[in-house]
């Protein structure tokens, strides 16, 4: 089986990371911001796996499992905050969250 070249895997990870970063900066909806963060975390995990497979080390796969568990925790906490913001302000706009500061 032919492995994917390091350059191609890192290029895909870079494109995904940039896509998530653009979504993070452009969108004002909290749900889309959380989705953009997930895309960025998955891009970083992909870079770990590609780099680990290049040198034949299982460290990339271990980091992938760690990143996925971190992403699951981030998603659950983020969605809980999102639900509370929606219940309180009836909107998912980020500017509504700045009103919480007082």
Curated annotation (Swiss-Prot):
Mode of membrane association: Multi-pass membrane protein
Enzyme class, first EC level, given as a word: translocase
The protein's assembly and partners: NDH-1 is composed of 13 different subunits. Subunits NuoA, H, J, K, L, M, N constitute the membrane sector of the complex.
Transmembrane annotation, as ranges: 6-26, 30-50, 62-82
Record-linked NCBIfam families: PRK05715.1-1, PRK05715.1-2
Main subcellular localisation: membrane
Catalytic activity reported: a quinone + NADH + 5 H(+)(in) = a quinol + NAD(+) + 4 H(+)(out)
Organism expressing this protein natively: Pseudomonas syringae pv. syringae (strain B728a)
HAMAP family per UniProt: NDH1_NuoK
Gene Ontology biological-process annotations: ATP synthesis coupled electron transport
Family under the similarity heading: Belongs to the complex I subunit 4L family.
Gene Ontology CC annotation, any one: plasma membrane
Superkingdom field: Bacteria
InterPro entries: NADH_UbQ_OxRdtase_chain4L/K (IPR001133), NUOK/Mnh_C1-like (IPR039428)
Location in the cell: Cell inner membrane
Protein name: NADH-quinone oxidoreductase subunit K
EC code(s) of this entry: 7.1.1.-
């Amino acid at each position: 089986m032919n492995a994917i070249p390091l350059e191609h895997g890192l290029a895909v990870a870079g494109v995904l990371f940039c896509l998530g970063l653009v979504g993070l900066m452009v969108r004002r909806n909290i749900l889309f911001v959380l989705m953009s963060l997930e895309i960025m975390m998955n891009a970083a995990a992909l870079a770990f796996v590609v780099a680990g497979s290049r040198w034949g080390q299982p460290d990339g796969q271990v980091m992938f499992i760690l990143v996925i568990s971190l992403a699951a925790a981030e998603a659950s906490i983020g969605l809980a905050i999102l639900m509370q913001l929606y219940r309180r302000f009836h909107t998912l706009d980020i500017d509504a969250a700045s009103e919480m500061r007082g």
